[in-house]
């Protein structure tokens, strides 16, 4: 599939991208290469190949949840410069 500069310019406009003439030519060439490769992939016979979501078997390594002692609330709050009761006080961002 050949893509034209006009089509690339249209997509750039929809994406709110400004492309100068050099960028437009480069992008057209790159997209044309990508679409040509996609056409080659479409020609591959995948009949009888099971669909997969991962190239390898994905397994989760679960561990048992074990409750451990950690810092108390007072010890945790001691690490912050300003506390407000039971929480850190930070400057307003918005």
UniProtKB/Swiss-Prot annotation:
- Show the InterPro entries listed in the entry: Asp/Glu-ADT_sf_sub_c, GatC
Give the E.C. number(s). Answer: 6.3.5.-
SUPFAM superfamilies registered for this protein in UniProt? Glu-tRNAGln amidotransferase C subunit (SSF141000)
Is the keyword Coiled coil in the record?
Answer: no
> What general EC class does the enzyme of this chain belong to?
ligase
Q: Does the keyword ATP-binding apply?
A: yes
Q: Which UniProt keywords apply?
A: ATP-binding, Ligase, Nucleotide-binding, Protein biosynthesis
Catalysed transformations (reactions): L-glutamyl-tRNA(Gln) + L-glutamine + ATP + H2O = L-glutaminyl-tRNA(Gln) + L-glutamate + ADP + phosphate + H(+); L-aspartyl-tRNA(Asn) + L-glutamine + ATP + H2O = L-asparaginyl-tRNA(Asn) + L-glutamate + ADP + phosphate + 2 H(+)
Molecular function (Gene Ontology), one example: asparaginyl-tRNA synthase (glutamine-hydrolyzing) activity
GO terms for biological process?
glutaminyl-tRNAGln biosynthesis via transamidation; regulation of translational fidelity; translation
The family assignment reads: Belongs to the GatC family.
Concerning PANTHER family, the annotation shows:
GLUTAMYL-TRNA(GLN) AMIDOTRANSFERASE SUBUNIT C, MITOCHONDRIAL (PTHR15004:SF0)
UniProt function note: Allows the formation of correctly charged Asn-tRNA(Asn) or Gln-tRNA(Gln) through the transamidation of misacylated Asp-tRNA(Asn) or Glu-tRNA(Gln) in organisms which lack either or both of asparaginyl-tRNA or glutaminyl-tRNA synthetases. The reaction takes place in the presence of glutamine and ATP through an activated phospho-Asp-tRNA(Asn) or phospho-Glu-tRNA(Gln).
Describe, as the record does, how this protein assembles with itself and its partners.
Heterotrimer of A, B and C subunits.
Q: What is this protein called?
A: Aspartyl/glutamyl-tRNA(Asn/Gln) amidotransferase subunit C
Gene name, Swiss-Prot/TrEMBL: gatC
């Amino acid at each position: 599939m050949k893509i034209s500069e006009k089509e690339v310019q249209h997509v750039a406009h929809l994406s709110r991208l400004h492309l100068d003439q050099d960028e437009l030519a480069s992008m057209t060439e790159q997209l044309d290469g990508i679409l040509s490769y996609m056409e080659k992939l479409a020609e591959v016979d995948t009949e009888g190949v099971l669909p997969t979501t991962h190239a390898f078997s994905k397994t989760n390594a679960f561990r048992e949840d074990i409750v451990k002692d950690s810092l108390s609330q007072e010890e945790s709050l001691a690490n912050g410069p300003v506390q407000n009761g039971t929480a850190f006080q930070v400057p307003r961002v918005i």
